[in-house]
Amino acid sequence: MQWEGNLRKLETSAQANEHGQVAYSLRGADVLQALPPEEINAWVGERLQIHFGGQIHCRVSGQVLRKTYGEGMSYQAWSEHPAAVESVLRPELSRIHEGIALRDFEWEQKHHNQPHYVYISQTGAFKVGVTRTTNRPYRWHDQGAVAAVAIAETPYRQLAGEVEVALKEILSDKTNFRKMLANVEVDIPALEDWKEECFEHLGSVYEPFFIDESPEIFAYPVLSYPEKVKSLTLDKVPHIEGTLEGIKGQYLLFDEGRVMNVRRHSGYRVRIDVG
């Protein structure tokens, strides 16, 4: 089969597929026109060719670009678009719960003045993070977590960010993609230990927002994991060909340890040949 369009980040289903694995879809676009989703778990084990002809389109305006900013945007879009507001990366900066917008009032009301989780996930190591309650479990799929647990629920983003900042004193908020792309063994006892340590570290100030939930576990469609990761970009390698060994997080895992971050290439127009 053949697929052609502008890449967007991989999307997943809330429920695992019949094999108990995270179910992935490629939801690209024809410049700005959304394309039908293509289920891609079945691509694992197949020969894949990805051809990049040099065209990149801004995912906001459709403008032809030489380089992208903030996941497929032009510099102007990245500077002005609501989805690139600073409180996306630094939740503690949001002020929309006070009625103050940093960039776009309606967008921030819809996305940031909403209930949020603070969570711990196991990617390559254990990390703390923040996400809207409606983004569960997709956020965990995106980062390639093998397990995760929500430990607090707040009424708005800034407060979740405040909790996260406090927990960054004992936990990282970053994912090491090379460690994540290894065959990470689920460690629920360690996750539960971190949960209790976080509660203890936060203390009574944030206790009203604590929640006691069971961890969730995720399996990914991977035949074999790379022993040594070699990250590919279409700017440097415009033609990628090989056996697709798996999908984890936002990465396609090819043979010979080569990996490609699909989200990183949002806006890139490609042709994909499968089989």
Describe the role of every protein-language-model region:
Residues M1-G275:
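Non-catalytic accessory segments flanking enzymatic or RNA/DNA-binding domains
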